[in-house]
């Protein structure tokens, strides 16, 4: 299985710069996209061999996620299963017999951390959502998590030092594996 994830920061502009060619060249089973910045009906994206599944933000020109998939899923879910966070087009989940494929665009805390309370609330809801999926079958999560796990992941760590420790704690807790295998993240996150 091959999956690609890309924050396009506006799919319409990206289409004019060879998006379809990239999909064809890479030929993934799943192409997960964040920040589509589209509303329903604004774009007819037809790529041979793929079906698209979208979660649109209510706010025009904002957020949005999409998965292009070669095989049809058993089910499709939009959002993270909670009303407070269901209006920004942040998550598409496709269910298959052996796994869930999830694309996610996490909210940014923004300058001055003015959206930090919303971000923390989103993270808690996301943790519950992913744990619920993981209790049923494995989860493959692709996306832009808007998080730096350690200081080395930041271009300018000085002013962001406190945020790194906050996000490091969240990502370690959220992504610690519930099942251990050769591909577990436990050694990466500890």
Predicted segments, located by residue:
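Active-site-proximal beta-strand elements of phosphoester/diester hydrolases
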Residues: 1-9, 98-110, 142
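Structured beta-strand-rich core segments of catalytic domains in phosphoester-bond hydrolases
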Residues: 37, 42-109
């Amino acid at each position: 299985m091959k999956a690609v994830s890309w924050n396009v920061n506006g799919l319409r502009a990206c289409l004019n710069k060879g998006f379809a060619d990239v999909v064809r060249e890479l030929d993934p089973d799943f192409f997960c996209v964040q920040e589509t910045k589209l509303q329903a009906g604004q774009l007819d994206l037809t790529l041979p061999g793929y079906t698209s599944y979208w979660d649109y933000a209510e706010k025009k020109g904002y957020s949005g996620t999409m998965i292009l998939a070669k095989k049809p899923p058993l089910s499709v879910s939009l959002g993270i299963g909670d009303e407070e966070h269901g209006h920004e087009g942040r998550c598409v989940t496709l269910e298959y017999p052996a796994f869930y494929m999830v694309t996610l665009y996490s909210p940014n805390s923004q300058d001055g951390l003015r959206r930090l309370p919303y971000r923390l609330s989103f993270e808690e809801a996301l943790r519950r959502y992913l744990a619920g999926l993981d209790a049923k079958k494995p989860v493959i999560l692709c996306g832009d998590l808007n998080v730096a796990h350690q200081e080395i992941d930041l271009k300018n760590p000085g002013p962001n030092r406190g945020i790194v420790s906050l996000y490091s704690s969240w990502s370690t807790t959220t992504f610690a594996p519930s099942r251990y295998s050769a591909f577990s993240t436990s050694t990466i996150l500890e």
